[in-house]
Amino acid sequence: MRIRVPATSANLGPGFDSCGLALTLYLTLDIGGEAETWYIEHDIGGGIPHDETNVIIETALHLAPNLTPHHLVMTCDIPPARGLGSSSAAVVAGIELANTLAELNLSKEEKVRIAAEIEGHPDNVAPAVLGNWVVGAKLDGEDFYVRHLFPDCALIAFIPKKELLTSESRGVLPDALPFKEAVQASSIANVMIAAILRNDMTLAGEMMERDLWHEKYRSKLVPHLTQIREVAKSKGAYAACLSGAGPTVLVFAPRNIANTLQASLQTLEIDADVLLLDIEGSGAEVFY
């Protein structure tokens, strides 16, 4: 059996800690035979555990403590600490592992609830489970979210080789915003959501780049954001915004300029991968 979970990009600018989009990069987990102890075979490095302390197995055992150990093989296109939902993908993979081996028959709604409980909010985990674009909120311990089709466009991910921990990126955020600024920030997010629902990527893109919640504070940690925006706009892109906490920048563009824009971004003197991606519509899947 094989479990596949997509990468996700949270925020989309002003949709801070609420919006998330599934992307065509994947964490893939092949379930092998039973074993005496849990073991995840992978060549990712970075201190990611091979035993039951791995987040995937920890999550699975949290849901089904009596699971029989298995040999697992993990491959992952999602680079860690880049703002592409790698930790959320691992949590969702663990939920799918428990659901498959223990035959829990969890609904998608239950999977989102469990994952959001573990991660703290649904902005990454909901699109990882459901696919496409999700707007959500966690209120008084309850998850509220809406899945909707995102407008058709090209996605270009500018992924620096240097990682940025979410804890570091959150550390630069203020404890509070002045009331008038919060009202303006909220109105920008509202217009972005409405524009996306109307398939108006031109207006949505303008709002994406006017975020007041987090990007201006995080820009000191992601100095390449301004440079990428300038290149993207000069080529006709809709917008460029931080993916999650960064340092990845996600560019939204008309499909007919995607290859040209990708080539232009590859010429920047920043050590990074520049990937042409699509919106992932299915979310987490299990293949038998």
Curated annotation (Swiss-Prot):
- Family designation: Belongs to the GHMP kinase family. Homoserine kinase subfamily.
> Which pathway does this chain act in?
Amino-acid biosynthesis; L-threonine biosynthesis; L-threonine from L-aspartate: step 4/5
Q: What is this protein called?
A: Homoserine kinase
User: What organism does the record attribute this protein to?
Assistant: Listeria welshimeri serovar 6b (strain ATCC 35897 / DSM 20650 / CCUG 15529 / CIP 8149 / NCTC 11857 / SLCC 5334 / V8)
Q: Which GO terms describe its biological process?
A: threonine biosynthetic process
Instruction: Read off the InterPro entries from this record.
Output: GHMP_kinase_C_dom, GHMP_kinase_C_sf, GHMP_kinase_N_dom, GHMP_knse_ATP-bd_CS, Homoserine_kinase, Ribosomal_Su5_D2-typ_SF, Ribsml_uS5_D2-typ_fold_subgr
Provide the residue positions that the database annotates as binding ATP.
Answer: 79-89
Q: Which reaction does it catalyse?
A: L-homoserine + ATP = O-phospho-L-homoserine + ADP + H(+)
Q: What is its main location?
A: cytoplasm
